[in-house]
């Protein structure tokens, strides 16, 4: 009985390690093939990375452009608000000067 359980355990361990070994061998072969392809076509992989870098730079550039445009609009809105306030203050100053002249005319004569 002890021999059967030992044999069963040994068989079980052997069967579970074979797929693991096969995966390791398969990964190693894949890595070797990739290295050979990279060595024979060094520019192909770099083009892919360059295009990814270009896309990222375009995206960053687009984001910076949007930020710039947003800030520019904020400045223009603020400038318009200040112009409106200045116009309103000028009107109030003219009204005040008119009232002051009327008072001078009323009390001066």
Swiss-Prot record:
Residues 41-109 have a biased composition (Basic and acidic residues). InterPro entries: YjdP-like (IPR048164). It comes from the Bacteria. Residues 1-22 form the signal peptide. Residues 36-109 are annotated as: Disordered. Keywords: Signal. This is Uncharacterized protein YjdP. It comes from Escherichia coli O157:H7. The gene is yjdP.
């Amino acid at each position: 009985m002890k021999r059967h359980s030992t044999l069963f355990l040994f068989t079980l361990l052997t069967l579970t390690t074979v797929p693991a070994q096969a995966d390791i061998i398969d990964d190693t072969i894949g890595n070797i093939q990739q290295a050979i392809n990279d060595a024979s076509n060094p520019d192909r992989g770099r083009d892919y990375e360059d295009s990814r870098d270009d896309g990222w730079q375009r995206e960053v550039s687009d984001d910076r452009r949007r930020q710039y445009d947003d800030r520019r609009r904020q400045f223009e809105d603020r400038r318009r608000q200040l112009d409106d306030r200045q116009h309103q203050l000028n009107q109030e100053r003219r009204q005040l000067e008119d009232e002051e002249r009327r008072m001078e005319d009323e009390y001066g004569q």
